[in-house]
C-alpha cells in the first residue's frame, strides 16, 4: 500500500474524519484528501504530527505494505461468553462470580476496547473464560477476573462491589494509581510487588497480560507496545514465580508462561 493508502487506512481504523485530522494538523481537509489520494505528500513536520494523531510510527505511514491480511478484533461473541461464564458459575455455585458478572456488565456499559468498536466487557469475560479453560473454577478468581478493572476504569468504589472481602482485596491489589512520566517506575514497582505477594492476584494479572498482549497490536501505538514489552520483561517473572509456587496453579503457570513469552518473542521480532 502507498503512503496515501496507509494514511487513509489508519485514519479510518481510528474512526477519524478527514476534517478531524485536518483540524489537529491545522491544515485544510482538502490537503488530507490529497495525501490519501497520493496527489501530494505531507512535509516532514506534518508527517510527524500526523503519526502522533494516528498513534502510529512514521515508518508505518511511509512504508509500502505488500501483504494485507484481513484481521478481526474479537474471536468470540461477548454475550455468548457471558452466558457460558454465568452457566458455569451457577453449576459450581460460584455466587460471588454470578453477582460480579452482572455488576461488571453494567459498570463497563458504553465502554469500548482501545481503537475498536468491541465492548470493553469482552476483556474481563475473556479473562474469566481463560481461567475456566484451564480448569480454574474458583469463585475468587472468576469474580476477580470480572471486576479487576471496575475501580480503575469505571469510577466505582470498593465498598460498592457485590462480593466478599477477599475478592474486594484482590481487586484493590490489581488496581494501581494513575502515573506520570516522573513517578511511573516507582508506582509500577510497588504495584507488581504487591501483586506478587498474592497468588490469586498474580494468576489474574498473568491472564490479564496474556489478553492485553494479544490485542495491543490494534489498541496501542508502537511506543506503547515497546513500553508494554519492557514492562512485561521486567515485572512478570516475579509475578509468574508466585503462580508457579502455588501447587493448584502449576498447570496454568506452564500455559501462561508459554503464552506470554511466545507473544513477547513475536512482537520483539516484528518490532
Predicted ranges, named:
Residues 25-41, 63-66:
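Recognition helix of helix-turn-helix/homeodomain-like DNA-binding domains
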Residues 5-24:
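Short basic helix-loop element that most often maps to the first helix and adjoining turn
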